[in-house]
Amino acid sequence: TSCNAATGRSPGCFCNNDNNCRDTCCPRSDTEKKCTGGPDPCPPRQWPD
């Protein structure tokens, strides 16, 4: 699975783009901040390929 920070895989989620290719569920308003290397306090979720 490839990560894509521009498009989340489900509503309210976006690619955290870390080495584990995890999507992190956060409010959409947080997407820009977190996708540009901000701190990530949200619990990570694994999404299937």
Swiss-Prot record:
Post-translational modification: Contains 4 disulfide bonds.
Subcellular location: Secreted
GO CC list: extracellular region
Tissues expressed in: Expressed by the venom duct.
One Gene Ontology MF term: ion channel regulator activity
Domain of life: Eukaryota
Biased composition (Pro residues): 40-49
Domain notes: The cysteine framework is XII (C-C-C-C-CC-C-C).
Role played: Acts as a neurotoxin by inhibiting an ion channel.
UniProt-recorded name of the protein: Turripeptide OL47
